[in-house]
């Protein structure tokens, strides 16, 4: 298995983005909904008799329809207990449709071909905000037996829920509106304040900290008109240098300009020596790894003399050496701990 490296030309570059892309409007957000339900119509791929909660749920459902049956008498494998989730968008109105996600709770083999029965979706306050029902769609299933496909124990119901209860909003009555930066940064917050005060020709924006910008709506604008104009403004910003590592998939995402300082590091049987001031000629039996790297196969030492050694260079060379993904990830983490990488390292 080789590690997958994705390099993005982000670090040390100045970009422009709209305020809408950089911020959230405080109070204007999605709300999570959850419910417990049953999927029926499965072709023998549902929960087995060991999932007692499924049998009890079937019994309870049938009793609600005046059909009395004991859970111990139910032998159906065409039903599965599932958890149903959805997001209730800001300003959603009664009758609006929502997409829902469905995931098996028991030991069902597959939800393919199933139908979700009427399921109440509740918020964190315990109130019912939507009701879901409909046929399940499982995307990406392989048509060939034995071929890899997606997880067949999770599915979606497109437009499968109907909003029954609205969340009260006071957006149009708010005198002050708050923007929250998705990535806290003093410079970006200051840029937003400066641009908005210039556009509106008055002090309507005040950066309170590295994330929060307070807005005061001018009387001549409605709330909707004001926010529409605010959110469309372009702001110059510099993305934070970051290296993201996904340990599960062996993926490293890094800006192409993220440099690594001179260092000597040994991991297992691999030694990496970064010394841009020491020009090393290709010796006997040594291998040119490109990217400014030379491999001594005897000592298994990778000597890097490139004036600008980057995370991308090192990852590529280690890949060529056949290093395991977990070894490459460990080396990156140790480089960060040693202070050779100044960018933020995020492991997911």
Curated annotation (Swiss-Prot):
Q: Span of the secretion signal?
A: 1-16
Taxonomically, the superkingdom here is Bacteria
Q: Name one GO biological process term.
A: bacterial-type flagellum-dependent cell motility
Pfam families named among the record's database cross-references: FlgI
Q: Does the keyword Iron-sulfur apply?
A: no
The answer on whether this UniProt entry bears the keyword Signal reads yes
What's one GO MF term for it?
A: structural molecule activity
Entry keyword set = Bacterial flagellum, Periplasm, Signal
Got a GO cellular component term for this one?
A: bacterial-type flagellum basal body, distal rod, P ring
Q: Which InterPro entries match?
A: Flag_FlgI
Q: Tell me the disulfide pairings in this chain.
A: none
The listed locations are:
Periplasm; Bacterial flagellum basal body
Role noted for this protein: Assembles around the rod to form the L-ring and probably protects the motor/basal body from shearing forces during rotation.
Assembly information from the UniProt record: The basal body constitutes a major portion of the flagellar organelle and consists of four rings (L,P,S, and M) mounted on a central rod.
The record's section on HAMAP family has: FlgI
PANTHER family, sorted = FLAGELLAR P-RING PERIPLASMIC PROTEIN FLGI, FLAGELLAR P-RING PROTEIN
Q: Which NCBIfam families match?
A: PRK05303.1
Query: Member of which family?
Result: Belongs to the FlgI family.
Task: Please state what the protein is called.
Answer: Flagellar P-ring protein
Q: What is the lineage of its organism?
A: Bacteria, Pseudomonadati, Campylobacterota, Epsilonproteobacteria, Campylobacterales
């Amino acid at each position: 298995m080789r590690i997958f490296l994705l390099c993005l030309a982000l670090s040390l570059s100045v970009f422009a983005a709209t305020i809408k892309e950089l911020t959230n409007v405080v109070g204007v957000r999605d709300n999570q909904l959850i419910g417990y339900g049953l999927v029926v119509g499965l072709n023998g791929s549902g929960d087995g008799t060991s999932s007692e909660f499924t049998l009890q749920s079937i019994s309870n459902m049938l009793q609600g329809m005046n059909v009395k049956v004991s859970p111990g008498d139910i032998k159906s494998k065409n039903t599965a207990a599932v958890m149903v989730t959805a997001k209730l968008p800001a300003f959603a109105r009664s009758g609006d449709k929502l997409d829902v996600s469905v995931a098996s709770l028991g030991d069902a083999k597959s939800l393919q071909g199933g139908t979700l029965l009427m399921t109440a979706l509740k918020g964190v306050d315990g109130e019912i905000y939507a009701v879901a029902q409909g046929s399940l769609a499982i995307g990406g299933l392989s048509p060939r037996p034995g071929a890899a496909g997606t997880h067949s124990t999770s599915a979606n119901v497109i437009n499968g829920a109907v909003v029954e209860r609205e969340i009260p909003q006071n957006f149009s009555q708010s005198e002050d509106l708050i923007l929250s930066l998705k990535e806290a940064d003093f410079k970006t917050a200051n840029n937003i304040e400066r641009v908005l005060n210039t556009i509106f020709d008055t002090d309507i924006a005040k950066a309170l900290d590295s994330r929060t910008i307070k807005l005061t709506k001018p009387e001549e604008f409605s709330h909707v008109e004001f926010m529409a104009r605010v959110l469309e403004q372009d702001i110059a910003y510099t993305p934070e240098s970051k290296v993201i590592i996904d340990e599960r998939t062996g993926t490293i995402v890094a800006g192409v300009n993220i440099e690594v300082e001179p260092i000597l590091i040994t991991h297992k049987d691999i030694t990496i020596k970064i010394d841009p001031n020491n020009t090393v000629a290709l010796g006997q039996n040594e291998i040119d790894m490109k990217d400014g790297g030379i491999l001594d196969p005897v000592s298994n030492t990778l000597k890097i003399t490139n004036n600008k050694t980057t995370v991308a260079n090192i990852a590529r060379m280690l890949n060529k050496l056949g290093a395991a993904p977990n070894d490459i990830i460990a080396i990156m983490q140790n480089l960060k701990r040693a202070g050779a990488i100044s960018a933020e390292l995020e492991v997911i």
